[in-house]
Amino acid sequence: MSFRYLTTFLAVSIGFLASAKTVIVCPSCEINSIKTAVEKADSFDRIQISEGIYNEFDITINKPLELVGIDRPTIDVQSKGYGIIIKSNNVSISGLRIIHIGTSYTKDFAAIYITKSKYFVVENTELENVFFGVLVEKSHKGTIANNHISSDAVVEAGSGNGVHMWHSSHIEVKENLLHNLRDGIYFEFVTNSTITNNLSHHNLRYGLHFMFSNENEYHYNTFRNNGAGVAVMFSKKIIMTHNTFTKNWGSASYGLLLK
């Protein structure tokens, strides 16, 4: 980006932020639905979600927004679909608990589904009883950090992955706890991304799984009690340093599988 374009971008962004407002959501407030808050908010507004249980699903974000949970509010999807769907650039999600993502054999339902987005952040969330945790498709330049993602996977066919990325690039996945899933982290056609300081354990298949994903790095992660620690399949230029593999139990592979 040239200096001229960068200056214009910063000026426009600062102008938006200067006019941004905070939309308050709580069970007893005038706005007691996250969907309603998203609809009423303008681009670059902050939606502050207070403690409580919100029985909602398919909360779709089509504009730049910041969603912030206060005292860990819970979105109970009740196995009805996706939790939050992000279809815009510049979206940030933090401080939320999202539960009960139902299993499907026709759709990849996820607690947070990100598609065709840039500059997104998902951090400090708890995603429980998920099919997929954070599902990222055709998205770039994002961060997934400090999340706790878990399920109760029993068989591979009926379970999904904690962080699942497809046709994406320049994503940072760091300091997440992922367990009892199919794969903790799964990359397919993903490039120029980094995976650092994650703990991925007790997953049915792999702690970390690369498929057709080139020029990625993973460092300082721990892979414990998985079918296999890490699988690098049909992928090139993967840099791997300072990772710990322990007590992985698969019959065909243990710590690191290269194919």
Description of each model-found segment:
Residues 33, 56, 207, 217, ...:
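Per-repeat structural element of leucine-rich repeats
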Residues 42, 62-63, 70, 87-89, ...:
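Parallel beta-helix/beta-solenoid
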